[in-house]
A protein has these predicted regions:
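Short acidic-hydrophobic catalytic motif
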Residues: 1-5, 13-16
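ATP phosphate-binding glycine-rich loop
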Residues: 9
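Non-catalytic connector elements of ABC transporters
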Residues: 19-21, 28-143
Length: 143
């Protein structure tokens, strides 16, 4: 599971399971956090640990589809969120895959366990939604 959760390259991240890859540049790299500017997002990605890099360095941020939260209302968090709309939904019995087109143009895959019977916040095609993720949910890739 370490290769899946902590891939060391874009190739490994894409080879082992589904992944959303954000291309960007390091904005700040401190001991306890790094921020990454990504053209597809309105605000920098915030990661709650530093990396070995430098400002302006090209990196990728790998985020697994099951690590993303999907809501209709804007999350009460200062970073790691974006607005978009649901373009497609694939139902697989135990889970569904949502294809969300961000306002910046990038498409994300989001996986969720099916819980229709007790979930009051159901989603459907063309819904306007917010995607968000925690500060430690993704991996910064330098190669």
């Amino acid at each position: 599971d370490e290769i899946y959760e902590q891939p060391n390259s874009r190739y490994t991240a894409e080879f082992i399971g589904s992944v959303n890859l954000f291309s960007g540049k390091i904005d700040k790299d401190e001991k306890d956090f790094v921020t990454i500017v990504c053209p597809a997002l309105p605000d920098p990605i915030y990661v709650a640990h530093g990396v070995t890099g430098f400002e302006g360095m090209d990196v990728a941020f790998a985020l697994r589809p099951e690590k993303i939260k999907l809501t209709k209302d804007e999350p009460d968090m200062p970073h790691n969120k974006a607005h978009g709309s649901i373009e497609d939904i694939a139902y697989f019995g135990s889970h569904s895959v949502y294809h969300v087109r961000l306002d910046g143009g990038m498409k994300l895959l989001c996986h969720f366990a099916n819980r229709r019977r007790w979930d009051s916040e159901g989603f459907t095609w063309n819904d306007k939604v917010w995607v968000s993720w925690g500060d430690l949910e993704g991996v910064v890739l330098t190669s």
